[in-house]
Amino acid sequence: MHLKTALIATLLTIGLGASTAQASPQVVVSTKPLHSLVSGVMAGVAQPKLLIRGHASPHAYALRPSGARVLQAAEVVFWIGEEVESFLSKPLRSLARKATVVALGDTEGIHWLGLRKALVWGSHEHEEEEAHSGHGHEGGDPHLWLDPQNAKLMVQTIVATLQAVDPEQAQAYQDNG
């Protein structure tokens, strides 16, 4: 009888200990390039989940049931935004309602790249800078991470977001960023 009581006490102690330990947030990232940035910031803490796997393009991707489940469990979702991943707009509103959703294309200071012609960046000039802030970047190159300054700005946003969601690991995120 004492063995049974000791076993129950041990299981309760283990169970209570597990429930008080803070788990890392469930982080979902839309594309491989962004996943690389987020993985770097989360190194040593947790591994973010990649939504679009393989050689699939975010421009023509159809969300699978497994992807829907991943979004439902997400606490944080990083994506470029509707300009690149339009398929994600509705699922993020309906499936990831509880998640902190971060469109990295909206990061302050991001420079949207011009269309590439013959492997050379085209210009992305506007007559008025105010006109730049509100437009949807149609026709621009959405591969924002190719500009090192953009990548730095996105990493800063990733660090700040993860620190807000997971303050216990704030220093690790800062060190990795």
Language-model region placement:
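Positively charged n-region of N-terminal signal peptides that target proteins for export
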Residues: 1-5
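Bacterial N-terminal signal peptides
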Residues: 6-17
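Extracytoplasmic metal-acquisition and chelation regions
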Residues: 15, 23-177
